[in-house]
Amino acid sequence: MATAIRDVGVWRQTRTLLLKNYLVKCRTKKSSVQEILFPLFFLFWLILISMMHPNKKYEEVSDIELSPMDKSILSNLILGYTPVTNTTSSVMQRVSTDHLPDVLVTEEYASEKELLASSLSKPSNFVGVVFKDVMSYELRFFPDMVPVSSVYMDSRAGCSKSCDAAQYWSSGFTALQASIDAAIIQLKTNVSLWRELESTKAVIMGEAAVVEIDTFPRGVILIYLVIAFSPFGYFLAIHIVAEKEKRLKEFLKIMGLHDTAFWLSWVLLYTSLIFLMSLLMAVIATASSLFPQSSSIVIFLLFFLYGLSSVFFALMLTPLFKKSKHVGVVEFFVTVVFGFVGLLIVLVESFPRSLVWLFSPLCQCAFLIGIAQVMHLEDFNEGALFSSLTEGPYPLIITLTMLALDSVFYALLAVYLDQVIPGEFGLRRSSLYFLKPSYWSKNKRNYKELSEGNINGNISLNEIVEPVSSEFIGKEAIRISGIQKAYRKKNETVEALRNLSFDIYEGQITALLGHSGTGKSTLMNILCGLCPPSDGFASIYGHRVSEIDEMFEARKMIGICPQSDMNFDVLTVEENLSILASVKGIPANNIIQEVQKVLLDLDMQAIKDNQAKKLSGGQKRKLSLGIAVLGNPKILLLDEPTAGMDPCSRHIVWNLLKYRKANRVTVFSTHFMDEADILADRKAVISQGMLKCVGSSIFLKSKWGIGYRLSMYIDRYCATESLSSLVRQHIPAAALLQQNDQQIVYSLPFKDMDKFSGLFSALDIHSNLGVISYGVSMTTLEDVFLKLEVEAEIDQADYSVFTQQPREEETDSKSFDEMEQSLLILSETKASLVSTMSLWKQQVSTIAKFHFLSLKRESKSVRSVLLLLLIFFAVQIFMFLVHHSFKNAVVPIKLVPDLYFLKPGDKPHKYKTSLLLQNSTDSDINDLIDFFTQQNIIVAMFNDSDYVSAAPHSAALNVVQSEKDYVFTAVFNSTMVYSLPVMMNIISNYYLYHLNVTDTIQIWSTPFIQEITDIVFKVELYFQAALLGIIVTAMPPYFAMENAENHKIKAYTQLKLSGLLPSAYWIGQAVVDIPLFFVVLTLMLGSLFAFHHGLYFYPVKFLAVVFCLIAYVPSVILFTYIASFTFKKILNTKEFWSFIYSVTALACVAVTEITFFLGYGVTAVFHYTFCIAIPIYPLLGCLISFIKGSWKNIPKTENAYNPWDRLLVAVIMPYLQCVLWIFLLQHYEKKHGGRSIRKDPLFRALSQKAKHKKFPEPPINEDEDEDVKAERLKVKELMGCQCCEEKPAIMVYNLHKEYDDKKDFLHSRKTTKVATKYVSFCVKKGEILGLLGPNGAGKSTIINILVGDVEPTSGKIFLGDYGSHSNEDDESTKCMGYCPQTNPLWPDITLQEHFEIYGAVKGMSSGDMKEVISRITKALDLKEHLQKTVKKLPAGIKRKLCFALSMLGNPQVTLLDEPSTGMDPRAKQHMWRAIRTAFKNKKRAALLTTHYMEEAEAVCDRVAIMVSGQLRCIGTVQHLKSKFGKGYFLEIKLKDWIENLEIDRLQREIQYIFPNASRQESFSSILAYKIPKEDVQSLSQSFAKLEEAKHTFAIEEYSFSQATLEQVFVELTKEQEEEDNSCGTLNSTLWWERRQEDRVVF
């Protein structure tokens, strides 16, 4: 009984989801560890930075008087000047003779260019003077003599040992400046002032005690703290959007989840995590050097509130994104960008404080303002304490308040955006929904509140809708009226549903049928509220599905199993069920009981502790269904619930749904008509979004069915013509459906049911016709569907392309031989014309073309290679620019008062102050003050002797009286780099002013261009060479690892079975990979040498690099091919190997260079070892040796290191490795590559003798089925027969396979798992044998052995006319057809290119291929998909392509492993018709495996059922039905006016005809019975009696059907259930308890 509607509390759901989120975090260890360690890592890094860059506290420093101006500093000075004029010569003459006669040597240069050129070869005592005019000049010292920076103000730390500002005094710059100034003054005034200028003294200004704060580490600390908290928001956003992307959030909402609970569960989890992390980080930060004076509680509050706001910030972003991979990147990027905005606010002193708080809604900015305030309080107060929350420029109390408000704002915005932003799934509210009264006052609705009038009137009943019986009137649970749904795709509108109207009733199971894309899932999504209808109306118990609030009430009754599996991957089956049971509101004390019941009902106890991501496809569907039925919901909406399940599991599900049908509404969609036929009470067929019909099985079959199906199992002596004549004699309208050596099938129309008894009686009498047994079954629902949907389309298709027989209409115009020439793929007559070498060349070119196309279209690999190239080029360009910018970094500095002194009207600046003027004379200095006024220099008079008291000032001037004129003392601030020469310039200009000269002397300091030292050049070049080696080794896996992908998708197996020669495969890839790698490597090497043209070039030694490169490229490519055979289970093989290659190259460089310090011999040993053992190293070693050998000044002592000696091994080893890799590649190809169909002309080692295998006789099994035993003896006889006219195409004899499964590691005990047990069967040419069995029965093992992927333990296999391990020429089977279960298709290759590749591999010419492609695409309806890449194809089209590829080349043997998996009924019919047609010519054979019995019945001539690795039965479908079938099923539909008394009489009559008949659940208009086999002695008598009853009683129609193959299958698989519980729990008789109108009884 359905459970009543539950009201689930928000808090309970929150606690449940909190547990779920906690478990998810615990099991996604990678992200969880990052969330914990990332902040701590950054915190410890910041502590390290703060320890390395502490605030520098300087004690008070008194004035320091420098030694007098010393002319001896300029001893041996070479002074070059330009231009050479009378004036300049006169000036320099006075300097060299009058002022500095003993120390100067002057040189003349015609131009500055000559002067600069000469400086390159001059020693460091060379100084240049460049006159601009007589009053202006440049002094050019070498950079190591004077400061070169353009920064005018240095830090206090810069003067701790040697002061840049004092360099101008110690280097002789000011002495030379004074000398030239004196010469200019003398030239202008004829007055010599050299003695006064020479007497000038210099004093370093004293400084007060100060704390100096370094801005750079402070900025790093600020931005790092912002980034430290980013993992919380990053991973939270990814988790939430990932759940949205998988539809998990909407899935939870369908089960009644409150939005509040969803948000709260994540918020509480991350609040707890951030609380703990913030507390830990605050304690560490305050206990270390980061914030040592602050209160840990205050720091904790700041960290915690920021972490919380960053979490809400991430929540706010989640509604804006549909892909989890995007939201994480954007969240991190936005965090960093806003962090830098905050950094700008904090560090830019001129930023207006009034605007600072405008950025506080950005939590990153608010946090940075708070951290900056903490640092300020640490620097100038006692730290951030509660008592100082309101102090400082940006009070902390405001920051904390703003962070709290930010969290609230982000939370509200997240909820709002989640409600209004349209997503892919779910209903959305209007943008102003919170202003509507209805949102705040929700009234609950009753079930039946909506009347007929509310839903556009009653739905009209017509001929396509079967009226329901009276007992269902008024039980309409789901009402659908005029539903329409349209989607917008690019520029067109796609209508998914078109005016759909019908009712779904309580107490019934309703099936939605239709091909893929017909609108079934869309209707399901509308009913559960995942998407709103475009038009029309639907209600669930009166709740409108398009209204969010009403849908919330309806969802409390709904259990849903969507088409895609809905579960939490990292949780176990039991945890998934328990958590979702709690979400649904099942009482806590009943959850364990309910979960255990679901586990038992669906036979999932054995997997209850398995994580969902580790389940098979069928097990995941069981879990999804188990979630849907939890708590007995009143409404079940199931979208393809049994997809991917084996028959045993399907029957378990059917039993469960039938058992829970009463008082409940069950709606399911399916592609399997038998499932709908058996399970559903009413079926709604939808086509192109429109309703085709609604009704019961008997209504649909009688109205649209083709009738009964008569199947006769015949012997080899059967007179088929006489038999057909007998059938048509009784039933003229009978039609032949199928005929082969063992079975004949006719269709018998409904209208002739009264003649059935006569026909069956005649068959019983004429036993001499060769009919061993016969049976009858009613038309299937599949037939009805196809008649309604696609029969005409299927019949019109041309399947003759798959057979050697021409189409009927072509027979007149073309002979069979002509068709063979134009349509057959590599026919026998043409095969001899294609030599092995010609085919080899064709295959090489084909593989090369395919490989090139794959690389071209696989954007990920191309992007990776381009990115690596760009990284290398970017590093080169960056270092080149740095090199040249450093080279030209010297800028002229004009030494004028404006640098450091304020003008009138200027605002104070950090390095501009007024000039302190101290009068140490006994008189006034008005003329000096007038000079400063005339020069626009603001002065401040100073009378104290302690300059510290007047700090900070850029400089001061102390005036001392001398005999003739003033003598000055220049007092300069050591942090003002250019203040001393500026003061000297002021003094010189004062003397000019005093002598009535209005011009002023101008001076520039322009150091010579600084050349990069040789050691820097060497290190730079070495670094780039090492980088080249590391980056280039990372590239080959991205384009040479395709083999790993081909093995994963089994494309390589498919190619080998198609006749691909292994050597052609590898050479075809190498033809592309080697030139590509060579070009890339040449570009990188070319750029390396182009950017370093100054390298000393040794052509002979460079040839060694070239020779190394020639062999290195193929060596690395071949090694990569070998590596592709390993680590096949790694998800991203290319990325893994790229990382391994790069790390290995880096490690080699590191080891060789580190051991350099241990001695040259050790380095050489490692170099030689790496060259020999590591194939990616030789070029790197060769290149580094060449570069080191090209350096100048290599010592030439006896024991010196000579890099040229290391070149030889690096050059030779790649050549030797190439040979080794070729042999290893052959070895791995033989070991892991699978069986080759053709002999390889190059890889001859692959054609070795096969291993000797044992062929023991199977143990005697007395219970072995007689047909299985007969098949074994038949195979044995055929194997020993040397003169048989025609052997079967496939023979399998005593095939046995065991696997060793190591269970106990400690005791090393091994358990043996038997996959197949001495299986024997054969498949004749022209026959299709169906291999059936549950999961684990051994079907896939047999297929894998046949294709060569698995070696059998014992047994023999013969394919075509040769054994699988024969060494004879195999031209008879040039290729084998193979359609594997997983699609072996390349995602970036088009459908047409697949045909061309496989056609060329099989030896087809391009002309033949065009014709074949045209006909195949027409036959299988593939024309519109020809130019689409595989990744854009629907699943059904992919399966068609796999089948078509398996049939190319006219293979004698074809293996079809579940060929129609994932197809809708229309596509399956196309496939089945093509398969049947392909094998009519009697020259091919096929082995087909399947889970679906209807496929076996439709396609197979014989069926073999495997259970637990053994063959249990084999024979035709009819033979197995007759032999193993348990009974029949009878359905009777009564006329509406029949009375209860007559129904009782009819029931007694049925009991009389069939004494052991068991009545199933029935309704007033339909009676259903299961009839044991023993009650049906003769079909003719049974039909005769039923016809009498039809005329006697008010029976409108009836159906009487035999058991299907499905029943036989389930009966036999019960044995496997008993052995290993791989199937579900079934009842003892395996007779499914049928309820209303199911064709088959189980």
UniProtKB/Swiss-Prot annotation:
Stated role: Cholesterol efflux transporter in macrophages that is responsible for APOAI/high-density lipoproteins (HDL) formation at the plasma membrane under high cholesterol levels and participates in reverse cholesterol transport. May play a role in the processing of autolysosomes.
InterPro entries attached to this UniProt entry: AAA+_ATPase, ABC2_TM, ABC_transporter-like_ATP-bd, ABC_transporter-like_CS, ABCA, P-loop_NTPase, R2_ABCA1-4-like
TM stretches of this protein: 32-52, 220-240, 264-284, 297-317, 327-347, 355-375, 396-416, 866-886, 967-987, 1021-1041, 1071-1091, 1102-1122, 1139-1159, 1164-1184, 1207-1227
Keyword 4Fe-4S annotated: no
List of glycosylated residues: N86, N190, N458, N919, N996
Recorded topology in the membrane: Multi-pass membrane protein
Keywords recorded for this protein, A-Z: ATP-binding, Cell membrane, Endosome, Glycoprotein, Golgi apparatus, Lipid transport, Lysosome, Membrane, Nucleotide-binding, Repeat, Translocase, Transmembrane, Transmembrane helix, Transport
Main enzyme class: translocase
Tissue spec: Expressed in testis, epididymis, lung and brain.
Protein residues bound to ATP 2: G1333, P1334, N1335, G1336, A1337, G1338, K1339, S1340
Gene: Abca5
Changes after translation: N-glycosylated.
Binding, ATP 1: G514, H515, S516, G517, T518, G519, K520, S521
Pfam families in alphabetical order: ABC2_membrane_3 (PF12698), ABC_tran (PF00005), R1_ABCA1 (PF23321)
Catalysis performed (reactions): cholesterol(in) + ATP + H2O = cholesterol(out) + ADP + phosphate + H(+)
UniProt domain ABC transporter: residue ranges: 478-713, 1290-1533
One GO location term (cellular component): lysosomal membrane
One GO BP: lipid transport
EC number: 7.6.2.-
Record protein name field: Cholesterol transporter ABCA5
Family statement drawn from the similarity comment of this UniProt entry: Belongs to the ABC transporter superfamily. ABCA family.
Compartment annotation: Lysosome membrane; Late endosome membrane; Golgi apparatus membrane; Cell membrane
A single GO molecular function term of this UniProt record: ATPase-coupled transmembrane transporter activity
